Amino acid sequence: MAVGKFLLGSLLLLSLQLGQGWGPDARGVPVADGEFSSEQVAKAGGTWLGTHRPLARLRRALSGPCQLWSLTLSVAELGLGYASEEKVIFRYCAGSCPRGARTQHGLALARLQGQGRAHGGPCCRPTRYTDVAFLDDRHRWQRLPQLSAAACGCGG
């Protein structure tokens, strides 16, 4: 098990050094400021990581634009029934979305909302996913398809 953890750790470190992973920001905020899509930031090697204070992180995530965020969690914390001491990076989408009508659906929805016939609005959600792999307690690789968000956008 120690060899598996060492290999997985080495692989993660190598991916971070090659710009394939995500690294922490000293301030605990998204590295790129301004209006960027999560795909643009990911292609540029950017980072979205928050602070260790969950409530502050949640407030910041919900008040900012729709973007990709990361949490480092144990596999058990995912709540999917897997036994493993491994840590994985779980990426998710959070933030606000403008109510601008960019599509025919958006135009119709805005009109219906103005009439009080429809409720809600665009929501921040994943537009692309990635698989997550880890070594379980029986030394078997487990692959969880489409577990982690890879890009975010506003939909609805």
Curated annotation (Swiss-Prot):
Main location: secreted
An annotated GO BP: peripheral nervous system development
Keyword set includes Disulfide bond: yes
UniProt xrefs under InterPro entries: Cystine-knot_cytokine (IPR029034), GDNF_fam (IPR043401), TGF-b_C (IPR001839)
Compartments it resides in: Secreted
SMART domains documented for this protein: TGFB (SM00204)
S-S pairs: 66-124, 93-152, 97-154
Function comment: Growth factor that exhibits neurotrophic activity on mesencephalic dopaminergic and motor neurons. Acts by binding to its coreceptor, GFRA4, leading to autophosphorylation and activation of the RET receptor.
Family to which this protein belongs: Belongs to the TGF-beta family. GDNF subfamily.
Annotated protein name in UniProt: Persephin
